[in-house]
Amino acid sequence: IREMMDQGRDISEFVPNKAAFHTTPYDKSVFDQLVSYQFRRETPESLKTITDVSEGLEHRFIKVAKTSFGAEELATQVKTKRYTRTRIDRIIVNTLLGITGADTELPPQYARVLAFNKCGTQILKEMGRTSAIPIITKTADAVSAKDDFWRMFKNDLLATDIYALMTDNKQAGQDFKTSPIYVK
């Protein structure tokens, strides 16, 4: 589906109607610029704190970032038999979002509802009564969160804001304007 979206092809037969309607084409070149910028400003010390960066991999990223452009080129040149492409891709996104090893050691702080159907409505009610963590259906309700919850949630918001930069609607705060999708 992502590949089809990259190519501007119709995905409506593969996703619920409302999801297809809310899917915005994106410009991957903006992501490439952000990745190049971020890695060129990193230091070995700062990269070392990012999730999955170990064994001197931070030095490889710093060296390659000086001569490569974009996520694809960076990942291709950093990848080796020892470091899988999946791991490299994760490191790139974690670096862009500033997700550290300490962040990923936290237990889940919330569950965020992106879409639901009629059956899901009942499940959400039950989860609201029994869940040990908050169930977020409205982003504004989570703004007053503190400590570990907020630390995790701000990365969620940042990811959406970065995605928005790649779309026609570049305005930050889209999470506060978009409700979960009800699928009939």
Where are these regions (language model features)?
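Active-site cores that bind ATP or allylic diphosphates and position pyrophosphate for catalysis
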Residues: 2-184
